Amino acid sequence: MINKIKILFSFLALLLSFTSYAKAEDLHDKSELTDLALANAYGQYNHPFIKENIKSDEISGEKDLIFRNQGDSGNDLRVKFATADLAQKFKNKNVDIYGASFYYKCEKISENISECLYGGTTLNSEKLAQERVIGANVWVDGIQKETELIRTNKKNVTLQELDIKIRKILSDKYKIYYKDSEISKGLIEFDMKTPRDYSFDIYDLKGENDYEIDKIYEDNKTLKSDDISHIDVNLYTKKKV
């Protein structure tokens, strides 16, 4: 078993050992963000909402799926989608939710406190027989660092879940949302086996409030986990920008 693990890690290291081509000048700088934006980004990516195997038959405003008493501490949970079709897709289905949640400007459903979340929803029945390990290649100023690993047991996983997991690692290890940390720019790229790839500029936040930061996930973009090749992360320090 140990030998198999060593072979897996060696293969990942070989697979991910190509050169980074991301350009720092094309990315947003952390110095552009307010203290509030950095604090909210830290909170959103370090403390995700996670719930499995819950069901709702209630839709509000056509696009919001309502889970009574299923939020943290028994709050009502409002899951917001970009379209009514997405809300209908998950109505009356057992679902898993993994995402960044917020309270400010979350519309109340009842007398309970309401907790909101954009997307982050997958069907509970669609699980892998064996956990999938995805390698994340990290460069700082073009110098390759230790490969990070994220895991999922889902056949179809939201881009939000993967993004949160890798940003949590980067937050812990490189302090990306600390104002005084040396990292000033960054790009996360999800490299697929299919023609299309996906990327996030770490400091391209769409506002300083949590409900603004999280809105990029309302499309509930979902990837087949078997189609994900690996993740590339390019970080840049102030001295290199």
Swiss-Prot record:
Signal peptide residues on this chain, from the entry's feature table: 1-24
GO cellular component, one term: extracellular region
Cofactor(s) named in the record: Zn(2+)
Binding site for Zn(2+): 191, 230, 232
Effect upon mutating residue 227 to A: About 22-fold reduction in host MHC class II binding
Localisation per UniProt entry: Secreted
Matching SUPFAM superfamilies: Bacterial enterotoxins (SSF50203), Superantigen toxins, C-terminal domain (SSF54334)
Superkingdom classification of source: Bacteria
Cofactor remark from the record: Binds 1 zinc ion per subunit. The zinc ion is necessary for interaction with host MHC class II molecules.
Record-annotated disulphide pairs: 106-116
Family: Belongs to the staphylococcal/streptococcal toxin family.
Function as written in the Swiss-Prot or TrEMBL entry: Staphylococcal enterotoxin that activates the host immune system by binding as unprocessed molecules to major histocompatibility (MHC) complex class II and T-cell receptor (TCR) molecules via their alpha domain, in particular TRAV27. In turn, this ternary complex activates a large number of T-lymphocytes initiating a systemic release of pro-inflammatory cytokines. Also causes the intoxication staphylococcal food poisoning syndrome. The illness characterized by high fever, hypotension, diarrhea, shock, and in some cases death.
Name this polypeptide is given: Enterotoxin type H
Organism (species): Staphylococcus aureus
